[in-house]
Amino acid sequence: MAAPVQTIDVLLAEHADLERALADPELHSRPDEARKAGRRFARLAPIVATYRKLVAAREDLETAHELAATDESFAAEAAELEARVAELDSQLTDMLAPRDPHDADDIVLEVKSGEGGEESALFAADLARMYIRYAERHGWTVTVLGETTSDLGGYKDATLAIASKGDTADGVWSRMKFEGGVHRVQRVPVTESQGRVHTSAAGVLVYPEPEEVGEVQIDESDLRIDVYRSSGKGGQGVNTTDSAVRITHLPTGIVVTCQNERSQLQNKIRAMQVLGARLQAIAEEQAMADASADRASQIRTVDRSERIRTYNFPENRITDHRIGYKSHNLDQVLDGDLDALFDALAAADKQARLQQP
């Protein structure tokens, strides 16, 4: 299938304009605009590079056909170039297909304990560590915005902000957007004295954090703002003063906490950013609800019947129930080795999108 030339021309022109703009020192005096331009440039760069490779391969193929007409020894080269052109054309067509507009965004991820009491809180902490280790493998930064710990050091709830360090079309959201849902664990709890396997659950909510959250209007009268002492595990990165901030959005009941910034004002600003991202995500979900039932996969309650994945410790097995994915490397997955699973989820999502009318 030939690539849409008109679309390519538009993108090539935009890429050239951005390249000129980014070379202008004046743009970099406005950091927010420069970062936005840099991100867009990074998204276009692989498309432009693939297009240029395709153009070069087509020119080589045309030359090979001309030479093969008089010298059969060039026939094999022409066949290889035909395959190369087809491959690049397919890649470009895929790149030009509609994408999730948030794929380049960073994320905020919440982990909440559910059924299972203390064991559920310990499992929630395992999930948080799993995501932190995955982020570390990719060179991303993780900030713990808030946490409430259990008696045994688990998480009743924890909120993480995960950000990529560079400008890329495939950001944190593109990899981790499928994690929202109920995660079930089957194992012998540390509180179990008779060695019996128990089942408990923890919930994950993940939403994109766009660079600009300007579409959501937040009325100050809809907010209840509380200041409290940090309840985290301590350490240099956690405040021990009364600077932690909890913001409750009364119309929706959404609660956002932030405790790891250096001052109460900074914690409030960060919490407002997270609240804005959550409200924008909810607004987008509602807008898309009539068009697609896909978005219903995000959890609102922590109920084992809504599980998306099971972590079976006795069998070292992980099962993602949405796509039938199974692997017996649970120990590696909990250490952040999630790429194979995320690749499978992305492939299944892409296939589902292609089948939609």
UniProtKB/Swiss-Prot annotation:
Ribonucleoprotein is among the record's keywords: no
Top-level taxonomic group: Bacteria
One term of GO molecular function: translation release factor activity, codon specific
InterPro entries the record matches: PCRF, Pep_chain_release_fac_I, Pep_chain_release_fac_I_sf, Prokaryotic/Mito_RF, RF-1
Processing after translation: Methylated by PrmC. Methylation increases the termination efficiency of RF1.
Keywords on record: Cytoplasm, Methylation, Protein biosynthesis
Database matches in Pfam families: PCRF (PF03462), RF-1 (PF00472)
Disulphide bond pairs: none
Residues annotated with N5-methylglutamine modification: 236
GO cellular component, one term: cytoplasm
Subcellular location: Cytoplasm
Family: Belongs to the prokaryotic/mitochondrial release factor family.
Record function comment: Peptide chain release factor 1 directs the termination of translation in response to the peptide chain termination codons UAG and UAA.
NCBIfam families in the cross-refs: prfA, PRK00591.1
Record protein name field: Peptide chain release factor 1
Recorded name of the encoding gene: prfA
